[in-house]
Every structure is written in structure tokens, then in C-alpha cells.
Amino acid sequence: MSTETTKRAKRGVPEGLWKKCPGCNETIYTKTADELLGCCHECNHHFYVSGKERIRQVLDEGTFEEWDADLMPTDPLQFKDKKAYADRIVSEQQRTGLNDAAITGTGMIRARRVALGLTDSAFIMGSMGSVVGERLTRLIERATEQNLPLIIISGSGGGARMHEGILSLMQ
């Protein structure tokens, strides 16, 4: 147990009630940061917001229906750097609870149906591999076919995934 956790437990303060802003070092009530969509009220620093949390922020509660969750990354090149890509994918899936960096689907905003896609930087920095590209392509095609407004939110910072070579670059 960390010293901070021990101090918190001794004071009776629940874990996650407060967070420290890395932008200004202000201690912020987590609920306040959440109400500000992940921003610090003092300096406007933007905290990490997960893809699932972003869905909750954007769509009407309980309306999201995920598309193409069964698409899974493969390792066609059997790529290995410090770790085999196949092992990296499994560890990222276990760590994040995501199958890949993109989440796509449909939901409602003020009772209007929309198509929504987003990337989550927690999964290999939100980098684009073949699954990300395929999910976004299918999202765009379905939104067009169904005449739905399309919203894509990039939580990415990773670029194309080198582990998949040309397959990620073709996206």
C-alpha cells in the first residue's frame, strides 16, 4: 500500500474522491472535474477521459449500442519488438477492457439517433491498426446508408500502428 493510500485510509477519505491537477497542482473534487467534462476549474487542464466515459458524456443515458465489437486485431506480420505484438494486444485488452482503440456504434442525443465513433488513447495510445480503420470505415458506411448524423471523436495520439505494417497505413 502506498504512503498516500495509507494517509488517505487513516483520514477516512475514500479513494478517488479528490484528484491533483498536473497543470496547476490544485486539489480538485473529482465530481467537479467530471461535471466539467474532465477539465480543471482552475487552469483548464484536460484530464484523460476514457472512451466509455466520453460515450456517457455525449449520448443520452443507456442508448449506446456498440457495432463491430467482435472485430479483433491479428498479428499478420508476427511482429516482435520488446514484446510480441500478439502478446501486447492481449495485455492491452486485459489492462483496458477494450478489444482495440476504436469504439463505434449508435445512440441518441436528445432523442435523435446518431452514429458515434471514438478512439481511446488508453489502448496503445489510440493508434490506428486494421481494426480501428475497419470499425471507422463500417461506421461511416452505416451512417451514410441509414442517413444518420456522424460524430467521430479522436482520443488518439499514436498514429499508424507499426506492428501491422502496410495494413495500418492503408487505413
PLM feature spans:
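Terminal-region recognition feature
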Residues: 1-171
